[in-house]
Amino acid sequence: MADMASSIQAAAATQPDGMVISLPDPDALGAAIKAAVAAGVPVITMNSGLESSASLGALMHVGQPEYLAGQSAGARAASEGATKALCMIQEAYNTALVDRCEGYGESVPMEFTDTTSDPATIQTRATAALQASSGVDAVLSVGPHVCEAVAKAIDDLGMTVHHSCFDLSPGVMDLIGAGKVSFTIDQQQRLQGYMPIIVLHLYNNGAGLLPGANIPSGPGFVDKSNASSVAALAGIDR
């Protein structure tokens, strides 16, 4: 995060027409973003950081309301039989990922498992957590690489659990097709990169006009019913 804060400071010093910044850790990045705004640089946050965006002076946020997405995932998992879950989280400091877990937990009681982002470590920690947790019948993996590694752990243990995930990858799509993942939540990252640039263009060329609210890019469910259609858009609209 320190390197990212330094990059924000360096970019702001060039006085760009605008900056689009992901905000995974408001405490670590907030001062750099406030300084950019104070220097007259229009800032739009994207992906992570919805709750802190306005307080740091950003014009708006483009991204998925992560708590809502977690709530949606949890409600669906509960309707599909989940009663007790582990939430596999690769960045315990990332407020967006925490929100996914906590939103899910409104419908399905859950405990956090800090997996780190290393695939081998994810599988090892997931295996240990699944073995140690009595009564767990569901898992939420809040990133695609986490989803793939956790699926391997579940397979190796010979367990049958409800597994749902966040975000897309070829591996996640294969797991959905094989019936090993019930669904994944698509936050449409392409829109998170595209829409802020459109908004900044309008802001800089349209007398400072902005949309009337933040732009939500998700959540959307991808499951067996639509996975092939979504996969066909890879590299085109995703």
Regions found by a protein language model. Give the residues of each.
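Hydrophobic alpha-helical
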Residues: 9-38, 104, 115-175
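Conserved acidic residues
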Residues: 17, 59, 83, 137, ...
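Short beta-strand segments enriched in small/hydrophobic residues
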Residues: 23, 59-60, 84-92
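Flexible loop/hinge segments that line or gate small-molecule binding clefts
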Residues: 31-68, 169-177, 181-182, 232
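Structural detector of well-ordered beta-strand residues that form the stable sheet scaffold
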Residues: 44, 162-164, 182, 222
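Hydrophobic alpha-helical segments within soluble ligand-binding/sensing domains
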Residues: 60-85, 120-123, 168-172, 187-207
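Short, solvent-exposed amphipathic alpha-helices that sit
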Residues: 69-73, 92-110, 125, 149, ...
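Hinge/cleft segment of the Venus flytrap/periplasmic-binding protein
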Residues: 107-108, 191-238
